[in-house]
Amino acid sequence: MIFGVGVDIVEIRRIKEAIEKHNTFIDRIFSKNEIEYLKNRNLRPEFVAGRFAAKEAVVKSLGSGFRGFDFKDIEIDRTASGRPTVVLKGKAKLMANKYGNYKIHLSISHGVDNAIAYAIMEVDKIEDSDCKDI
């Protein structure tokens, strides 16, 4: 069953500025695997913005905000065909595991000015009182 839905939109211009002005931005937000992927794409701001939006959308689908974990606990990967996938680590994974088996569906897109990501989290069980059937 669907546990949560998250969507995030990011201005590519703001991500470009963050990359140019803050040497630590990429290292603070992305894992080594993600950085390698982004460097292979010359750190193009639209790709960085898409991955950033994806992390935000995943957090929203978890329904927790960044409580107890950080950006690197959510890794955005891709299949051989290019479909984006989510790998949860650390406390983000522990949080998702509370609901048994889970799957996160992810879509990322960008235009000239914005990048957007949409995440849907499916779980086996829901124990949160806010989510019980009436």
UniProtKB/Swiss-Prot annotation:
Gene3D superfamilies per record: 4'-phosphopantetheinyl transferase domain (3.90.470.20)
Classification via SUPFAM superfamilies: 4'-phosphopantetheinyl transferase (SSF56214)
Keywords of the record: Cytoplasm, Fatty acid biosynthesis, Fatty acid metabolism, Lipid biosynthesis, Lipid metabolism, Magnesium, Metal-binding, Transferase
Cofactor: Mg(2+)
Record field: catalytic activity: apo-[ACP] + CoA = holo-[ACP] + adenosine 3',5'-bisphosphate + H(+)
Keyword Transmembrane helix among record annotations: no
Binding positions for Mg(2+) per the UniProt entry: D8, E56
A Pfam match: ACPS
EC number: 2.7.8.7
One GO biological process term: fatty acid biosynthetic process
GO cellular component: cytoplasm
Compartment(s) where it occurs, according to its Swiss-Prot or TrEMBL record: Cytoplasm
Entry keyword Nucleotide-binding: no
GO molecular function terms attached to this record: holo-[acyl-carrier-protein] synthase activity; magnesium ion binding
Role played: Transfers the 4'-phosphopantetheine moiety from coenzyme A to a Ser of acyl-carrier-protein.
Family statement: Belongs to the P-Pant transferase superfamily. AcpS family.
Protein name per its UniProtKB record: Holo-[acyl-carrier-protein] synthase
Gene from which the chain derives: acpS
